[in-house]
């Protein structure tokens, strides 16, 4: 599933006057959009107006790092940045706390980073500080989860509605009449969770016989496990759709513990398809399918 790429920077290749090099248009860089967005935004062709090499500092505000998908994102970014001697990445981990993330973003603003990348914990609380960065003249990239403003430079993220739609179309092939679906949500206040839900239910809209149950796992495996233990009548569940693979794996563990035979037969799907987590879980049968959410 391709990334969605929105950017207000338009036009064909730009010429950097000091060194005479062209910066190619963004659509040529879809394989690794994160770093190449930064390179374009700060005209990273290895020079300043004096023609001397300048060190570029990228500030990254992550809402959390304790997650296989985000670990993969960070790893991809570090690998790509290692190709450039003049790029440094400063990574901040908000540990799923809005106030911590706000303070960390303001710290990056004070450091006058060349580019600021924000992956918000929740949209509304982070909106104002994202606007602060943008108004301070720092190119500000929002990734994964959206903010409630247009005061940012660009947004990079997966098409979460299409991910949900694909998951729903997959589910439609396996749902018996009058099936009961358990949906394990990410954080309900975040755009990926809302869009993955909407795509999923839209794909199944014609199936008026279906029923849905919902628990909020908040993207976290431990929270998903805790909420699963509160589930009433697990024997009624015919299908499980989790908003990420780690919560899907937690669901498999729960249902096997409840009934080893039925728990293994129950069809469970997730999202992310990250190497070392979801992909291996599909291969070894812990989950039945995983839908790709690109890390950028």
Regions found by a protein language model. Give the residues of each.
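An alpha-beta-alpha
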Residues: 62, 66, 77, 165-208, ...
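Short beta-strand elements at the ligand-binding edges of bilobed clamshell
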Residues: 91-93, 147-170, 183-187, 214, ...
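Hydrophobic alpha-helical
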Residues: 115-134, 200, 213, 217-280
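Flexible loop/hinge segments that line or gate small-molecule binding clefts
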Residues: 123-162, 173, 180, 274-283
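Hydrophobic alpha-helical segments within soluble ligand-binding/sensing domains
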Residues: 58, 101, 156-181, 223-225, ...
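Extracytoplasmic "Venus flytrap"
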Residues: 59-80, 84, 89-103, 107, ...
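Bacterial signal peptide processing site
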Residues: 48-50
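C-terminal motif of bacterial Sec signal peptides marking the signal peptidase cleavage site
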Residues: 44-46
């Amino acid at each position: 599933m391709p990334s969605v790429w929105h950017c207000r920077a338009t036009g064909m290749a730009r010429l950097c006057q000091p060194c005479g090099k062209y910066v190619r248009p963004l659509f040529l860089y879809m394989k690794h959009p994160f770093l190449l967005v930064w390179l374009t935004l700060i005209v990273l062709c290895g020079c300043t107006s004096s023609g001397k090499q300048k060190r570029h500092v990228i500030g990254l505000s992550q809402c959390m790092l304790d997650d296989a998908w985000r670990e993969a994102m960070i790893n991809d970014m570090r690998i790509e940045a290692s190709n450039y001697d003049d790029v440094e990445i400063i990574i901040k981990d908000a540990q799923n706390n809005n106030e911590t993330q706000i303070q960390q973003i303001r710290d990056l603003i004070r450091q006058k980073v060349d580019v600021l990348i924000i992956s918000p914990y929740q949209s509304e609380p982070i909106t104002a500080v994202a606007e602060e960065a943008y108004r301070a003249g720092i190119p500000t990239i929002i990734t994964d989860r959206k903010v409630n403003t247009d005061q940012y430079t660009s947004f990079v993220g997966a098409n979460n509605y299409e991910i949900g739609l694909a998951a729903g179309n997959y589910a439609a092939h396996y749902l018996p009449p009058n099936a009961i679906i358990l949906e394990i949500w990410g954080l309900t206040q975040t755009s990926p969770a809302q869009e993955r839900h909407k795509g999923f239910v839209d794909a199944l809209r014609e199936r008026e016989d279906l029923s849905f149950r919902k628990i909020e796992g908040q993207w976290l495996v431990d929270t998903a496990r805790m909420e699963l233990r509160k589930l009433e009548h697990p024997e009624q569940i015919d299908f499980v759709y989790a908003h990420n693979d780690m919560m899907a794996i937690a669901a498999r563990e729960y249902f096997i513990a409840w009934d080893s035979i039925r728990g293994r037969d129950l069809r469970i799907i997730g999202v992310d398809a990250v190497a070392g987590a979801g992909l291996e879980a599909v291969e070894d049968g812990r989950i039945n399918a995983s839908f790709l959410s690109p890390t950028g």
